[in-house]
Amino acid sequence: MKNMTKLSLITLALAASSSVFAAPKTFVYCLEASPSALSPVLSTDGASFDVNALPIYNKLTDFEDGTTNVIPSLAEKWDISEDGKTYTFHLRKGVKFHDNKEFKPSRELNADDVVFSINRQFDPNHPFHKVSGGNYEYFIGMDMQNIIDKVEKVDDHTVKISLKVPNAPFLANLAMDFNAVYSAEYAEQSLKAGKPERIDTNPIGSGPFQFVDYQKDATVRYKAFENYWQGKAKIDRLVFAITPDASVRLAKLQKGECHAMPYPNPADIENLKKDPNIELMSQSGMNIGYLALNSSIKPLDNQKVRQALNHAVNKQAIVDAVYQGAGQVAKNPIPPTMWSYNEAVQDYDYNPEKAKALLKEAGFENGFDTELWAMPVSRPYNPNARRMAELIQEDWKKVGVNAKIVSYEWGEYLKRLRQGEAATSMIGWTGDNGDPDNFLNTLLSCSAVEAGSNYTKFCHKPFEEVVLGAAQESDKAKRTELYKQAQVIFKEQAPWITIAHSTVYFPVRKEVKGYVMSPFSLHNFYKVDLADK
């Protein structure tokens, strides 16, 4: 019996030592573009949020995996006043922050961190408001500065947010990545050290992964956070390998150099389905690919010109050539899977003669010259912007519009779009919270012009009144009717050429377990594991 006991102890010791010295699990994701920033409050694009938000930070609320359902996160629960204008959040206890060589947290997350994180974007007099450029495009684009009245600490674990007006999607908005909660203590220490921008370049959060380093245009590396409040991740290391070319991403995936990749070329889909080492996940995208027509640049300030450019584009031919069976022609600025989608809206048919007639009415019988900006990266809503640009260029030439194709590196491209430099630009959007407001307000409102997320500079008061009215309405049926009205106004004004809604494909290697696709086309690897080959 004693010998058996000794043997058992030896076996247990060996098992323990083998687990201690087991090779760390490293998950490599082939990311499609370099992050525009390492701070989610300074970002708007999905590639950046994949890198700078989901691994590092938490929000007050979150979305249930694979759905648009809002669930508690840093706030365990909340109360809403009868008039819908006061939200009281009760914070989770025991949430720890990361550390690094320059910062060791002395306390757990509390109300000070929540108040700091919101007020940094909301209050122009806040000491961190202008740090790192102070461009809070998403916060302003969502009209948060006109929704929020004040943010108050009630006690260490209670925060009260008062609104100027009721806002139906407010809880969903708080679950979006631009509302990440930062460490106020880290910010204060960074400010005292004369390095306030450190909170954006060497990030500290409370999320499942801890930032290690960023090699520009190459890799972003993380390690699992041992003290994460939801439990340590199953993988030990997370690496984003920046790989803009979809063909190169695929080659890396097939060779096992990365475990997952976004946005494969449509032409590769059939082969991926047959690959025994790959699981090809897919879902209908909550997205829209479109061509923004900048109404602040002549002659695009003329509604008839914008309508003519719509009639001049053969969208079905584009969908066939670029999406290759993985997309459908778009007529509205929101996807057909979203509530309030207006089926009754009539699209601009492909009609070059009608386009010429409208151009003549607008005083451009002989056409005009313009620029056509094409994204340098694959996105869920546009797998090949260069090819799409070439097709549109050919279509416009038939009606006398000569377009020069222009492109820049992704971060520079977005920066220039925000500044309003592009006359016409390919871009798109994947919904972030499941609400039509996230498309119609964020991309097309007057406040979005100020924020920089409305690349058309379209500011049309009748449209604005309907969209803001819908956001303040709590009755979903009434909101639906208002959003349907907004889609009619949008189509008449033609600030975009709506191109397509896509099917989103996500190939992963067979050893990847536990990954759930997000309706927002964001990629969260907290629950992912790697099985033995």
Question: PLM features: residue spans?
Answer:
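A structural "hinge/loop" feature
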Residues: S34-D50, L74-A75, K101-K104, F170-A180, ...
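A bilobed periplasmic-binding-protein/Venus flytrap-type ligand-binding module shared by bacterial periplasmic
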Residues: K223-E226, G285-A308, A312
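N-terminal lobe/hinge region of extracytoplasmic solute-binding protein
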Residues: C30-E82, N119, H126, I204-G205
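Detector for C-terminal structural segments
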Residues: F27, V51, Q215, A312-S340, ...
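Surface-exposed binding/hinge segments that line
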Residues: D123, P127-A187
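Structural transition elements
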Residues: V329-A362, R379-R387
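Ligand-site clamp/hinge motif
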Residues: E197-D200, F225-N271, A389
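Aromatic- and charge-enriched surface segment that lines or borders ligand/interaction sites
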Residues: E76-P127, K160, P299
